[in-house]
């Protein structure tokens, strides 16, 4: 399977492309994931990756793939690729948030993903129900009734994506501020944006106001939570 993808930061019509990012594509396992291939984005943030599909990829034993894009020691974004895997993907903060929540219970202490086939495939479906990895936008499920503007889910995804985007886009002190309010349950400070959002997903009651306030620095993902929807 040939995957044509891109890595960028921010939502809307003009996201910031991320050139020179290392894109690692993994096949999740019951233990450590298999690194299937690794490529680098060009100056426009685009990449092409060839993924040999597992011969054991069946309906009863689906193989689950995911991509992690790393630009610097602090910037790490993710997208779920399902069991196909997808042939087109746009990796950004929104796909990272969706993946963190969908796979939350499968992240190991080193932030790799591990689990058995069927539960992992269900998590992949959950990720796609939150954000379309092909378009890099909120899924149709999230954008339409009974979700849409009738619940806070779409806006919450936007706010959390904006929280990560400030760090990704190099806003002064944004990464430091993000990592300070997103420790793991055991108190370990994260060092990447992916680790930070996974910690948020696993510890939803921790530092809620501090995390929410970071979402106002960069506001390129819309809709986002308004003041009366926030915790303050």
Listing of model-derived features with the role each one plays in the protein:
Residues 1-232:
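Feature for extracytoplasmic/surface-facing segments of secreted or surface-associated proteins
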């Amino acid at each position: 399977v040939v995957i044509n993808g891109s890595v960028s930061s921010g939502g809307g019509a003009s996201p910031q492309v991320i050139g020179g990012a290392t894109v690692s594509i993994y096949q999740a396992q019951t233990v450590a994931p298999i690194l299937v291939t690794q490529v680098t984005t060009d100056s426009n943030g685009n990449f092409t990756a060839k993924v040999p599909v597992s011969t054991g990829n069946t309906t009863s034993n689906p193989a689950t793939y995911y991509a992690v894009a790393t630009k610097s020691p602090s910037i790490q974004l993710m997208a779920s690729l399902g069991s196909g895997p997808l042939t087109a993907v746009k990796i950004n903060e929104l796909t990272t948030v969706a993946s963190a929540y969908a796979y939350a219970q499968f992240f190991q202490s080193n932030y790799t993903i591990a689990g058995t086939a069927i539960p992992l495939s269900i998590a992949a479906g959950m990720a796609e129900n939150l954000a379309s990895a092909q378009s890099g936008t909120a899924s149709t499920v999230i954008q339409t009734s009974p979700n849409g503007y009738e619940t806070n889910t779409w806006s919450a995804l936007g706010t959390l994506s904006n929280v990560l985007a400030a760090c990704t886009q190099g806003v002064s002190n944004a990464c430091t501020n993000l990592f300070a309010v997103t420790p793991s349950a055991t108190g370990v400070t994260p060092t990447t944006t992916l680790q930070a959002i996974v910690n948020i997903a696993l510890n939803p009651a921790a530092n809620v106001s501090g995390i929410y306030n970071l979402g106002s620095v960069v506001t390129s993902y819309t809709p986002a939570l308004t003041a009366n929807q926030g915790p303050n």
